[in-house]
Amino acid sequence: MVLDLDLFRVDKGGDPALIRETQEKRFKDPGLVDQLVKADSEWRRCRFRADNLNKLKNLCSKTIGEKMKKKEPVGDDESIPENVLNFDDVTADTLTNLKVSQIKKVRLLIDEAILKCDAERIKLEAERFESLREIGNLLHPSVPISNDEDADNKVERIWGDCTVRKKYSHVDLVVMVDGFEGEKGAVVAGSRGYFLKGVLVFLEQALIQYALRTLRNRGYTPIYTPFFMRKEVMQEVAQLSQFDEELYKVIGKGSEKSDDNSYDEKYLIATSEQPIAALHRDEWLRPEDLPIKYAGLSTCFRQEVGSHGRDTRGIFRVHQFEKIEQFVYSSPHDNKSWEMFEEMIATAEEFYQSLGIPYHIVNIVSGSLNHAASKKLDLEAWFPGSGAFRELVSCSNCTDYQARRLRIRYGQTKKMMDKVEFVHMLNATMCATTRTICAILENYQTEKGIIVPEKLKEFMPPGLQELIPFVKPAPIDQEPSKKQKKQHEGSKKKAAARDVTLENRLQNMEVTDA
């Protein structure tokens, strides 16, 4: 995932100042731009020198051939005149005045210079790439500039009643319908491990079927993706920080052959966006085939490093969940990708409106965007039991930022194009099932149970098409209130103090008696 290098090159029409400004607006290090420009300038000089050295080497070979054809003596003199040691000044006439043995010696020296130049070029290329991979995409003008997501995300619109309050949060409701095993899940899988069971399994499957059908009716091709990716491919779709904070690494044998002891390093996917982004890797996509729209279905795996203490109970924030994803390859021309961006968020809105989930759409501030996103809109549902908005959908236009590293090009082959162009790539959540279940539970709770949303009834089994009944008490009702806990703790402290006082008195009495 990278920007076009020509954007950093003034002689190619680029504007490093614009990228530096973008880095500042993202609250990232603008010095990376200067480091890249310096490394790129040196790299280009090095490549220019290597090209000239190769031309000179070819000229040496040509001159030797001509001299041999004329049957000139080879000679045994390998001394090199001073004027020849400066390769920049060597011409065909210079070489003509040398013996074949001398030209061969010059050619050997040129080979050494080329090797040295290539080593320097590779080093500079690595330095340039290290800076390039950490420089974010150019921002859309409508992105709010701030580093405070909580205070400055811009609310674009609201749908439904986002003021209503209800009694229970999803943490209690998943237990009340007997659809969740948290403690046992943690024993088996560790923190945030869980078993989804009973009615919530059917509700999850209903959401998956309804989301896939909705997207298929809008021209999306359903696609079930691999759950893990090779390291070299994941590096092309994920930014560096994700490897430490989000992705799980798995190691297995590199071959099915019993005598092969090599091991492969792979990564579990955090979203189906990652494998779908690589689906057309190294391809040319024809204009008449665009847009290509996929409805990705996958299990997603996330470490959630940095989320310690947040949403530790229930199924809202977990390490493993199912998700339906919108993913689109779009033309880079005529504002097509931005039109698609609006279409994708509208599709997500229609889905949640049809489920009767109130929400607002927020424009995410620049400092909270990942490197690839030029702009991101989130759909945050209203959770009446929790009294808060919670994110259900993220919709991003990454323009050509991802496609460039994956080499997914637009149009015909390079021979048919003046300049290579890259497709634009967009992604948007349709339905992360565990989070959507939480939203449904809170919004559709009654005294007796959870009303099944109208659109999901046909996907639910007989007996569960109208109401999911409560079969267990709410955990919060079983716990002592904070006031009761405080009073109980106070009573324990007073009792302990009385015991100490009584013991001291008894000891004093024993001393007096003695």
UniProtKB/Swiss-Prot annotation:
Entry's localization field: Cytoplasm; Nucleus
Residues bearing PTM N-acetylmethionine: M1
Motif (Nuclear localization signal): 482-494
EC number: 6.1.1.11
Enzyme class: ligase
Biological role: Catalyzes the attachment of serine to tRNA(Ser) in a two-step reaction: serine is first activated by ATP to form Ser-AMP and then transferred to the acceptor end of tRNA(Ser). Is probably also able to aminoacylate tRNA(Sec) with serine, to form the misacylated tRNA L-seryl-tRNA(Sec), which will be further converted into selenocysteinyl-tRNA(Sec). In the nucleus, binds to the VEGFA core promoter and prevents MYC binding and transcriptional activation by MYC. Recruits SIRT2 to the VEGFA promoter, promoting deacetylation of histone H4 at 'Lys-16' (H4K16).
Family assignment from sequence similarity: Belongs to the class-II aminoacyl-tRNA synthetase family. Type-1 seryl-tRNA synthetase subfamily.
Assembly and interaction partners: Homodimer. The tRNA molecule may bind across the dimer. Interacts with SIRT2. Interacts with METTL6; interaction is required for the tRNA N(3)-methylcytidine methyltransferase activity of METTL6.
Name used for this protein in its record: Serine--tRNA ligase, cytoplasmic
Annotated organism of origin: Oryctolagus cuniculus (Rabbit)
Gene it is expressed from: SARS1
